[in-house]
């Protein structure tokens, strides 16, 4: 993936030798395959910027911790759902990024924490590396290094989590993750279960200590509150996903309830670099693409699938699809039809 750029903190992870039975790297030109590599998280990704997808993930599982360092050439939006027994920690590894990442600014200086069963919409701009790490719930909450107030904070997190504003904490977790990945390469190639448990315990203890020290110094966490623009974007995004509402002609009326037309457009521009209409077209195009790739739809025509998603002009769907993703998958579908 020659076009991917190693920026700032990402460079440390790119230096890892990943030829290991435990530590892996995958360069992918398939968005769905890229999303499937994340453990402890259910991801559905939407490609926001055009071009054949290029992404990279370095990942490892050490006992009950899973670490992923991800980057893609394209801007993407990830719909994240955390497993019921995991906490998810997210850090942007590009501390010079001026754009919003996961809906907030100040990239590189915060830790986004999602609770077990948590959900989030996470837009990331082009060439934006992120660290996603899942930790087993009980292992973290039972840590001796977690002070009671912090344990209670973790237990009472809302479903959409919190952004903890702390460059020191972000750097500490990033360094812990790097150390764990290095240990996974150096020690765990022989699948030594006991060693994995030791590394896991050290990682849990360090995470717990980092959050506890941050809390004790500040007498609480400095959190980044979601802006009205982010709230407006998320609500408008939900409305645009309602195909029946939009095809019925009520979409603009519903969007107008969220604020002025300009404020809604600014909210979309800030978070996904496009207006609501363009975003809606990309979501419908994404849904059509997903159906085109599913075997149960192979006997349906491309025109019918496009119409189901509100893309009613075959010539337009072909042109838009080719511009955004590359050539339509006609050959794949013809092969599948013959097989069936």
Mark where each language-model region is.
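Conserved short histidine dyad/triad with adjacent acidic residue
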Residues: 21-24, 50-82
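Short hydrophobic/aromatic patch on the recognition helix
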Residues: 264, 268, 316-317, 321
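Short, conserved beta-strand element in jelly-roll/cupin
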Residues: 82-97, 133
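Short, conserved glycine- and acidic-residue-centered signature motifs
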Residues: 82, 229, 281
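Short histidine-centered beta-strand/loop micro-motifs
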Residues: 71, 77-84, 101-103, 122-124
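Alpha-helical bundle regulatory/interaction domains
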Residues: 2-48, 96-244, 250-261, 274-275, ...
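Active/binding-pocket-proximal capping segment
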Residues: 259-264, 270-271, 281-287, 335-336
